Amino acid sequence: MRKSLVISSLLFSCLAQADLLDALKYYEEKHYAQATTEFNKLLPLGNEVAAFNLGAIYHNGEGTAVDHVKALTYFQLAAELGDSRAAAVISALTKKLSDTEQQQAKQQASLLLAQVQIKEIAEERTDLIDFPEVVSRRAPAYPKNAAAKGVFGYNVLRFVIDEQGNVSAVEVLGSFPEKTFNKSSIAAVKSWKYAATGKKHQGKVALHYSLGPLSKSKVTQFMQKHKLLEYAVAGSPQHQYMLGTVMDLLATNANYHVNIDKNLALELTTELPEQFFSRKSSFRSKIVGFYGSAEVKTDAKGIVTAVISADKMDKQQASALLVGKELDNDARHGHYRLWADPGKTLYVEPIITVSQLHSSHYWWSMAAKNGSLEAQRQLAAFSPQWENYLLNNNDAQVLTWSGVRKMLQGDTVQGQLLLDKAIAQNYQTAAELKAIL
């Protein structure tokens, strides 16, 4: 039973795998108490595989007495969290238990589920509400050493805009490669100018660095050198986070708009889509009355045959304006994304649709559930669930920027409380920000 329930989790669900490396190491060395502790640490993060493996431990009676009620409890929790294997085990196990025991397991699973802090990982929030208009925003200078070596990368930064529209404080939240582009990014953001609104604002930006579309050979070489896919699939949160970062860089620097289809099969392959590296570029067109963005299909002449989705306009309104209109001869038999500001030129960008395996959010979410602080902080920027989880764990960086947001929203008492908690951890940025707010 041990082979079929615990070890097979690596084989049957490697694509949805939690961070089982430490726990499985303890398990294989028969340190069952430590393995149980490690699995339990992941439950608040909504880690379905940890729940499944706890069920297996109690089912097998390894390091503990066999307890089918507890086993069913954890298998039911795993099912609630999305583990597709749990249903078959639950079906077999319930046949061994009385109605009373089944009810006990159901109640215990509900209690455990109530303690899960991350139940759905989605892009839930944007910080661009009431954001001032851009006056000037120059691109960062490419560091000479990085350019000479063909190094690509990115920075994620948060910043504060003062009442006059000047950037008064900047912090690098994430970087790849480590610190390579920090100086250039900070200098660029500090030079940005926004419309004066008479009040302060908080902003967040990701700055990507590449000398044109990324080189397939260089990206592949990097992934192979660090064995990103192999270790990510094996459950390493560090490799999952890095793989997500690479996917983010590929999508951002591609000349195609990247669509993620959650319904596509998760088929492991080391071969990256050619469209990530294609030099086919977007082009311009003009369709009177259309604004916002939309996804469309075209025929052999580049004429729009269907509108798949639209944002600023409803789909019916966008269809009335777009269907039957010719985009360009280069837009034949394709799937395209259109976007335009009111009364402005229409931009047409080809679309590539890929599975979640080529999604940064997929790998960052997995890494976060598996304990990667970097990934958790990345997701906390737009997910209240991850933000609250890190606040509850007194993460200084999240305390700082959540405190800033609270103060800018007028909740001075709560904002200062959060900043003070970060300052108590000697987080210098928190002290600097408190002084200017």
Question: Language-model features: where?
Answer:
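Hydrophobic face of amphipathic alpha-helices that form TPR/SEL1-like repeat modules
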Residues: 19-26, 51-60, 91-96, 246-249, ...
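Hydrophobic/aromatic packing residues within the alpha-helices of TPR/SEL1-like helical repeat arrays
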Residues: 39, 75, 228, 364, ...
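Short proline/glycine- and basic residue-enriched helix-capping loop/turn segments at helix->loop/beta transitions
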Residues: 113, 117-158, 184-224, 240-251, ...
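Alpha-helical tetratricopeptide repeat
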Residues: 19-27, 36, 52-56, 225, ...
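Alpha-helical linker/edge segments of TPR/alpha-solenoid repeat scaffolds
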Residues: 63, 93-122, 218, 385-386, ...
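N-terminal signal peptide c-region/cleavage motif recognized by signal peptidases
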Residues: 13-15
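Short helix-capping/linker turns of helical repeat alpha-solenoids
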Residues: 19, 26-31, 44-48, 60-62, ...
